[in-house]
Each structure stands twice: as C-alpha cells, then as structure tokens.
C-alpha cells in the first residue's frame, strides 16, 4: 500500500482496530464501509454510498445512485406484490459464494434477492442467517419441492468435478429433471459486487415469474445497472468472461456440467 502513496484508503474490512492501526501506519485516513445483511438493498449500503459521496465531493451522484437502486427495487416489487403465498414457486439458490467459491450445498434461507422479488425460498428452516452449507441429505430431501434452481456461476468450477464423479447428483431435484435450472452471475466470494446483486434480483424475479417479466431483457438490465454503478454498459464484457459462461440463462441440464460448456 505504501508504494501506491495513497491520499486515502477505502476498506470493506469492518474491523475498527485494524483500520485504526493501518491509518496510524500509513499516515493517511482509512475509511471503512459496511453494507449489512441486505446487501445492495440495505440502508447501511446507502450510508456507505453517502459517505463516499461526501469524501469525494460527489454527494449528488451518491443520491442519484441510491435513488436508482430504490427505483429498480420498486420496479421489481410492483410486478410481484399481488402474488399470493400459495402461488409463489419454490426456488433453490445454489452455490452462493462465501469466503471463496463453494458448491451446490451452499445456500441461504434469507437470500435477499428472493425476498425482494417475492420468491419463495425452498430453504426455510436453517438455524442461522446468511450463506451456509446444508447437508447432502437435506439437499436430497428438498429436491421434490424445488420448482426451479438458480446456480451461482461462482460455484460451477467446483460442481463440475463432483458431477463428473456422479452425473446423477441432481436427479432427486424435480427442477433439474424438468429442466428448470438457471445460471446467474457470480456476485459474492470474499466481498460483494453490488451491481451484480441488483441484476441477480431481476433475474430471480424473471426466473420465478416469466409471464410477468416477459418484457425484461437481462442484457438490457445488465447494461442499465452497470451504467448507473460504473458509468458504462458492461453486459457484453461481463458475459464474455470465461467464468460468466455466457451470462444469464436457462442451462441445458444434459450438457452444462458435463464439460461441453464452460
């Protein structure tokens, strides 16, 4: 860090003592940011954006971004707010990143994209919040309840060798047997890509409610959100990355993990 001669250091590591120690060592301000459990939809994320706006004298831009996120959320919720509980499909979020890449057993019962999109999470009885692995037996037991599965792209490289050993590993999942398996972009490993978390919420909604989101094009959503966050449309560039596997899609269950893709 010293070789970069920074004027300020922005940290996402929420340890005040370590931040203070680094600040003393470097002799420049060290600012720590937090987002909270609801990721891009959390008020603490908004507070962090506002803080950055103040630091860099871009408060107007910060408020514009916060307003954009709120409008995107409202746009999703407006399409799903009237859906009765019994009409919500049960979806399994598969392979969430958690301090690195994981496999199909890493999930979350409080996955915020499902809550915002008004999607029923097939996992509901874990003992703690946040991303965590479930037992293989539990995954099997949940299989018949899965109307759809959404795989996080970060987990694909770890699932492929498991699938090579046992190509029947998903056969207990009704969603897999019926071809209702989908791929979202990786958004979290050690830290979070907040723009992707927002785009993934649109994809969760479109996956669960295709009729209500028929007019939503994921490339257009990706370009719109990356422009708001990063200043330019990036769908083509992101989808072209090897570990994006072509971007948002319904996957071919016969070939995707068998080595003919990715």
List PLM regions with ranges.
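Alpha-helical, coiled-coil/dimerization segments enriched in small aliphatic residues
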Residues: 103-131
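Acidic/His-rich segments in extracytoplasmic proteins that coordinate ligands and/or metal ions
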Residues: 2-55, 133-171, 252-259
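Short, structured coil segments at secondary-structure junctions
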Residues: 25-29, 117-118, 177
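Short, glycine/charged-enriched secondary-structure capping and boundary segments
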Residues: 23-25, 105-108, 164-165, 197-198
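Active-site/pore-lining binding-face segments in mid-to-C-terminal subdomains
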Residues: 147-212
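A residue-level marker of the well-folded mature domains of exported/periplasmic proteins
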Residues: 111-118, 134-144, 204
